[in-house]
Amino acid sequence: MSVEKWGLFEVELKGPAEGNPFVDVQLSAEFKNGDTTIKAPGFYDGDGTYKIRFMPSVEGEWSYKTQSNADALDGQMGSFECGTPSAANHGPVRVRNQHHFGYEDGTSYFSFGTTCYAWVHQGDTLEEQTLKTLETAGFNKLRMCIFPKDYIFNKNEPAYYPFEKQGAGWDFSRYDIAFFQHLEKRVAQLGALGIEADIILFHPYDRWGYAKMQHEEDYAYLRYVVARLAAYRHVWWSLANEYDFMLKDKPMEVWDHFFEIVQENDPYDHLRSIHNGNVTMNYDHTKPGVTHVCVQNWDVKRMREWRAAYGKPVIDDECEYEGNILRNWGNITARELVHRYWICIVYGGYAGHGETYEHPEDILWWSKGGVLVGESWPRLKFLRGLVEEGPAEGIEPFAGSFPWGRTAGGGRGNYRLIYFGEHQPKRFGNGLPEEGRYEADVIDTWEMTVETLGTFEGQEPIELPGRPGLALRIRPVEG
């Protein structure tokens, strides 16, 4: 059998079905290729079937041997060949250049994410429509919950539940296999679209009791989820959406331990973050288990502050949503969301998109997916294209308070990207390269146009159209 590098190899075994296999049976395997040895956890997949999933990161022949407390599963051996990755397979996303990201093969990755919290709980018709929308929307990351959601516009029952029923409640020690097979089917489909699955492990919006499980039940759930999903190269772990709203039941030391469990059980070291609710309740993102910063904050001009405070990549995944609902977090204009996104990018960070327009059947993109009806997403797709044409290592913000506390400016080398936002200067000269010739383009961030102004040299101010929503791009001229 052959699997591409960073693909998914699966070992399937038959073992005991009696008792509670989720609790009673431990299973793992050691995979070896030359001097490389990786231990991967296994999991129970129902009907006496056990699986171990593995993501090979080295080409060549791999061998494996299982370890288990069940005789039928212990000492099973095999091998497979790992081949070259396909053209669209760049491996997992990693932190690169301290404040940015990149795929493991060295290809740049600039996070342009959107939000569909409960999309995997809406039934096949709507879920397939969501995937169809994502094919062309231009996003390369999706924030999504494992657990179903109980919240405004989210009162429908899910198609599947994560645990087996026990009387009027749930047996939190027995996982519903159909639920998890459905979840991983959708995760795999995101991967086929080139979209990173930012998987939210806990959230407070719950009427089923999943947010109030005992700590040991939480720990077992985390181990099971990681065993099932970690071998998908495009998975990220978000420990929680709005963790601080659950501190009564899950105090800070428990969240710290959640990070430890995920890290210990994920042999591929996928990206890990945690999301705050109250803007004053950022997690301590300097902790070693946190790979990058995820914040909820409307004040995007603090991006440089967060970068400096945490020393890691920063994504303001919830800088409020384009929409028209009653809640303030969901009724900013498309222009305002595009404006905030540009500020985050030019200040050397990243942002997240969401859409919350009222719908007669409560099908709001931010939670249930479906179709995009707003105006920000094509402009964010346009911005992504501009960023991907820029420095492969990412943009670094300009230092100092003037003018960069009001006008967002950043770059790398003699590349510059200056976003004026609400300002409308007729001439601008700050931050231009001191030496060499360069080409200047004026970008209309709403109309999605790029106009070349000419070739310049030195720091003489450049004439501009003088209207809001413009950006200035500077690129060095070779020769």
Label the predicted regions.
Residues M1-D35, A40-F43, S79-P85, F402-G409:
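Non-catalytic, glycine-rich low-complexity segments
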Residues S2, N20-P21, G323-N324, L337-G454, ...:
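Aromatic- and carboxylate-lined catalytic core of secreted/periplasmic carbohydrate-active enzymes
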Residues E30, I38-Q98:
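Extended acidic/polar, glycine-enriched regions
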Residues G42-Y44, L453-F456:
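Short beta-strand segments within Ig-like beta-sandwich modules, predominantly Fibronectin type-III
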Residues P56, L73-Q76, C82-P85, H285, ...:
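Mature catalytic domains of secreted/periplasmic carbohydrate-active enzymes
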Residues H90-R302:
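Active-site mouth of glycoside hydrolases
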Residues A211, L247-E253, I325-A334, S367-K368:
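Short, flexible/disordered intra-domain loops and linkers
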Residues T286-E361:
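Catalytic-core region of carbohydrate-active enzymes that cleave or remodel glycosidic bonds
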